[in-house]
Design a protein with these regions (language model features):
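DNA major-groove recognition helix of helix-turn-helix/homeodomain DNA-binding modules
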Residues: 26, 43-54
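Short alpha-helical DNA-recognition segment
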Residues: 15-34
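Alpha-helical residues within the helix-turn-helix
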Residues: 12, 23, 52
């Protein structure tokens, strides 16, 4: 499982929407969707926030 599959699985397993996680990261939902699709690399600060959140 690569990182994009993992962040999606974590989000879905916890019943969170992309919008909720995007709000946590202070980004738009479309940007977060791009993270899950692998279209955009996740900045380190966002990875740290995700790790602390989950």
């Amino acid at each position: 499982m690569d990182y994009k599959e993992r962040i999606r699985a974590l989000r879905e397993d916890n019943d969170y929407t992309q919008s909720r996680i995007a709000g946590l990261l202070n980004i738009g939902q479309n940007t977060y969707a791009d993270y899950e699709l692998g279209k955009t690399r996740i900045p380190v600060d966002s990875l740290i926030k995700l790790a602390q959140f989950y």
